[in-house]
Amino acid sequence: MSLLLPIGTAALSLSPAERTSADEQLLEWHHEAAGYKVRHVPATLPDVLKTKRMLDWEYASVRERRLPEAFSAMQDQLQWLSSGVSDYEIAVPVHEIESCAAGTAYYKGVEKSVRYEQLGFIADQCDQMFPRLRIFLFDAHRVFSSPVTIFGPNLAVVYVGQCYLAFREVERVKSLSSHFDWLVREAVVDARNVSTHIRSLIER
């Protein structure tokens, strides 16, 4: 369930970010944006591109494990992405990829085979779905972003941990779109080179 709150001329929708209701809500937003470009800054690696083994590791610490439902939701999102209904741009801090490759920070304790399979899958999807899927890597020492998704010109959603803040006021959506454009301009690895960069990290 979401709650609409008036903020000036805008409407702010608060939706719970708990699995798996959040996954269902995200899929609804993706379908709503059919035909429009979707832009996304994930909290970690992009959920839509996570492998089952990576999700299994992430869910290991969750009290009520709902991995089957979560993986099914991710598969639905990946199928939507593969359909080519919308172009999809993702901006990820380069240190996120490097940490996954090295098994440091958030990925400390993840088996090497799990981490490398995950990165290999992302690289493969980049090759197979380019240019409708474009991933850019930015340097978080130079630029920063909270997790956010812009669903075309009419909806932008910011992730704040326990809930999603969804903005539908045009100027707010434009502002977040401009923010994403800034991340792309400042990218240290362009979408054309991301798969090569990722493979270089796991082939060392």
Language model region names:
Residues 1-16:
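Basic, Lys/Arg-rich alpha-helical nucleic-acid-recognition elements, primarily the DNA-binding modules
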Residues 30-203:
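Hydrophobic protein-protein interaction segments
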